[in-house]
Design a protein with these regions (language model features):
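Short solvent-exposed strand-capping/beta-turn motif centered on an Asx-Ser/Thr pair
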Residues: 48-53, 105
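Intrinsically disordered, low-complexity Pro/Gly/Ser/Thr-rich segments with frequent PxxP/GP/PP motifs
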Residues: 67-99
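Short, surface-exposed beta-strand/strand-loop-strand elements in extracellular ectodomains
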Residues: 53-75
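Short connector loops at helix/strand junctions that flank enzyme active sites
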Residues: 40-43, 55, 95-97, 109
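Hydrophobic beta-strand residues in large extracellular and virion-surface proteins
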Residues: 48, 58-60, 79, 100-102
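Beta-strand elements of well-folded, non-transmembrane domains
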Residues: 50, 64, 116-118
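Compact, glycine-rich, soluble single-domain proteins
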Residues: 41, 63-64, 86
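C-terminal interaction-tip segments
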Residues: 1-39, 45, 104-120
């Protein structure tokens, strides 16, 4: 399979974790799939925006190997009203069954765009 850039998006994320790559709310659901053997995904960007007129706090979590390890990319990070923040300012390598979740402290408050290089 050829290398390709992909964007995963989600709108109005709230107080239930949203798994961006599996496009699933509430429970981990497989994460990255369909990779060519020996290949990976490189996350090159992750932008989270606040849809509301009040501040929100977000968590962005990397789930490695189908959720066996969890690492916070940010925890309780405040995003001012109507603002956005770039979570990834470098690159993060994702493997098969890895995923990224976003959750907010406020219902229907956050949008996310996750940009990846697939089959790198």
């Amino acid at each position: 399979m050829a290398t390709a850039f992909k964007n995963y998006t989600a709108q109005s994320i709230g107080t239930t974790a949203y798994y961006v790559i599996s496009q699933n709310s509430g429970a981990f659901n497989g994460g990255v799939s369909g990779l060519t053997s020996g290949k990976a995904v490189i996350m090159v960007g992750c932008m989270v925006s606040n849809r509301l007129t009040t501040s929100i706090a977000i968590d962005v979590v990397h789930y490695q190997n189908a959720g066996s390890k969890t690492t916070y990319l940010c925890k309780s990070l405040a995003i001012p009203a109507g603002d956005a923040i770039e979570i990834v300012q470098g690159k993060i390598v994702l493997m098969t069954a890895d995923d990224i979740s976003v959750v907010s402290n406020t219902a229907s408050s956050a949008d996310v765009v996750l940009s990846i290089l697939f089959d790198a």
